């Protein structure tokens, strides 16, 4: 994806790709969008130049005292550098209503001191964002779910893949070699997928590896072949151990212990039998439980996780009620993009780092049709002593990206969100909220902005005691405090994502979700042969002895059918040792 800032006469480096825009809002005012503005034509360029000058002037006059010349309130500095606002996600090109800068001034939350922007000034700012900043989709940015479009691709035989890996690993010193593993996209090239689609998988792999990292560093996998289909990783770069890798390969239905001299050399150097896995399977499997939880070492309960993070939520809330230091802040609202009912989100500062936060949501089941929520489920009636039905946890990893955990009403870890409590309305192909996968997609731009509705509601109500009013005021932070902390956490995530170099969108979808949905698609003969690492002729020759593939020469089979029978069929094709042919080494 290429990015043009019209009138700015500047082009972002390709490494950044599409910058991470401002998060969508979570809460009551989240549903609007400015629409598809399209690209300015030549007649508009002069107007854009004038609007750019006017926007710079009005931001200088109204905002620079807090957000420029070294002042960086709310993690926002250089307010008059319009390219910076776009690059760092404070302005979403072509969409004012999803841009932090516009939303803050349009809602009158900013500027904190001084007169709010007038209608004409708001129109100027909105028009500049909607019309004069454009994200231009690259024609090569293709959906991963599209059928392969490059039938001329020549598959890389398995023996050549092994030779490439062997030539790479023998150059490493012994310690590095033992921590080295490989992920392959070669079968996608062999199946006829074009470079643009394979590039999408590269972005998904890069993003996911760092979303699964226990290390403070961002690390991209290293391509070892000219076609960039074979990738090397070092376990230590992600804070993983050999046990972590074993948990991955133990889950792999495509695991094959390859034979031959090259494979033997690799196994000896890496000190492991299963040194290579298919990258698209890894993206699919490791982005969701149980493997997601295993790799990130997320324990069985919310309370154990908080202990690992050095966090005492109960004590923090008690301290906040006593001292009001904004170490804990909440926002409650009626409508959410994920929850069927009202919702509360709560932020804690992680003690290990000023840049890492722990967010906890309190979610509630929808009231039965024709009935009202019970008082202890209605956060406007019970903002302090509610009884939640479940929740989502988001916390910053050491590298600044996010990790996720779904819990039930008792704080026990669950793999999917209860459908009566939460759903993923932004991904109709996968409406069930799957921990990890759905969360990465929903929070692809960091925290979703929330606006509290509780404090104002309670302040106008005679139904609360003086102490309850004070407690609500201390927990449900003022808008400027809550916004500042949200923007701080957004900046932490955005900076980490930029460091990965991964695009925020592939074929119009978040990369990991796009790869997951594509992986679930049907398997044809060419794809099957490529995944086995053999020719289509080799598959057809053995077809009568294979399971689940009897019609693959005429029609596709489902991914589930192909996967369930892979280990057996790999034995029939004699490509190596699987769980179903342990004696193949002697053949």
For the regions a language model picked out, list residue spans one by one.
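Bacterial N-terminal signal peptides that target proteins for export
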Residues: 1-10
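C-terminal motif of bacterial Sec signal peptides marking the signal peptidase cleavage site
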Residues: 15-17
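Solvent-exposed helix-loop boundary motif
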Residues: 20-30, 35, 39, 44-123, ...
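Periplasmic/extracellular electron-transfer cofactor-ligation site
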Residues: 56-79, 130-141, 435-453
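Axial heme c-ligation environment in periplasmic c-type cytochrome domains
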Residues: 73-77, 102-126, 136-137, 496-523, ...
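Domain-exit/linker segments immediately C-terminal to small folded modules
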Residues: 142-152, 448-542
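Extended surface/linker regions that mediate inter-domain or inter-protein docking
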Residues: 170-441, 447, 453, 571, ...
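C-terminal non-catalytic accessory extensions
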Residues: 542-587
């Amino acid at each position: 994806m290429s990015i043009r800032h019209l009138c700015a006469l500047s082009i972002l480096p390709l490494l950044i790709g599409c910058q991470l825009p401002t998060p969508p809002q979570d809460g009551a005012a989240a549903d609007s969008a400015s629409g598809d503005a399209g690209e300015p034509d030549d007649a508009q360029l002069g107007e854009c130049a004038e609007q750019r000058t006017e926007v710079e002037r009005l931001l200088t006059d109204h905002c620079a005292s807090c957000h420029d010349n070294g002042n960086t309130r709310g993690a926002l500095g250089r307010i008059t550098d319009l390219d910076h606002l776009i690059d760092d996600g404070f302005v979403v090109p072509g969409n004012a209503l999803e841009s932090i800068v516009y939303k803050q001034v349009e809602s009158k939350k900013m500027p904190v001191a001084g007169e709010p922007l007038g209608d004409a000034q708001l129109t100027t700012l909105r028009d500049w964002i909607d019309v004069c900043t454009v994200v231009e989709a690259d024609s090569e940015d293709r959906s991963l779910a599209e059928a392969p479009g490059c039938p001329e691709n020549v598959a890389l035989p398995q023996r050549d893949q092994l030779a490439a890996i062997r030539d790479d690993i023998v150059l490493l010193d012994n310690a590095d070699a033992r921590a080295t593993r490989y992920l392959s996209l070669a079968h996608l090239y062999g199946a006829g997928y074009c470079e643009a689609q394979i590039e999408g998988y590269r972005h998904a792999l890069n993003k996911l590896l760092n979303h699964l990292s226990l290390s403070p560093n961002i690390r991209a996998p290293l391509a070892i072949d000219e076609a960039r289909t074979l990738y090397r990783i070092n376990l230590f770069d992600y804070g993983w151990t050999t046990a972590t890798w074993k948990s991955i390969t133990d889950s792999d239905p495509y695991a094959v212990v390859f034979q031959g001299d090259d494979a033997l050399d690799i196994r000896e150097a890496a000190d492991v039998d299963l040194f290579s896995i298919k990258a698209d399977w890894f993206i699919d499997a490791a982005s969701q439980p149980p493997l997601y939880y295993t790799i990130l070492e997320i324990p069985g309960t919310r309370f154990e996780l908080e202990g690992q993070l050095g966090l005492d939520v109960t004590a923090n809330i008690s301290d906040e009620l006593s001292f009001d230091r904004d170490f804990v802040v909440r926002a409650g609202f009626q409508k959410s993009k994920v929850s069927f009912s009202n919702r509360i989100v709560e932020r804690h500062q992680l003690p290990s780092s000023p840049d890492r936060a722990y967010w906890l949501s309190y979610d509630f089941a929808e009231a039965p049709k024709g009935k009202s929520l019970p008082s202890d489920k209605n956060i406007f009636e019970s903002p302090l002593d509610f009884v939640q039905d479940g929740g989502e946890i988001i916390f910053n990893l050491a590298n600044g990206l996010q990790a996720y955990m779904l819990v039930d009403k008792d704080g026990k870890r669950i793999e999917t969100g209860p459908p009566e409590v939460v759903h993923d309305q932004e991904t109709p192909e996968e409406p069930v909220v799957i921990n990890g996968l759905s969360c990465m997609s929903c929070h692809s731009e960091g925290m979703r902005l929330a606006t509290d509705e509780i404090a104002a509601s309670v302040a106008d109500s005679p139904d609360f005691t003086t102490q309850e009013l004070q407690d609500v005021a201390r927990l449900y932070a003022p808008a400027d405090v809550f916004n500042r902390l949200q923007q701080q956490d957004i900046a932490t995530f955005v900076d980490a994502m930029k460091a990965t170099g991964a695009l925020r969108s592939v074929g119009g979808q978040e990369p990991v979700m796009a790869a997951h949905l594509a992986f679930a698609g049907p398997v044809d003969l060419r794809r099957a042969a490529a995944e086995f690492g053999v020719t289509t002729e080799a598959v057809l020759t053995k077809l009568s002895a294979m399971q689940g593939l009897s019609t693959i020469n005429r029609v596709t089979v489902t991914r589930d059918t192909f996967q369930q029978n892979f280990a057996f069929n790999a034995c029939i094709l004699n490509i190596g040792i699987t769980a179903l042919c342990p004696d193949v080494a002697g053949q």
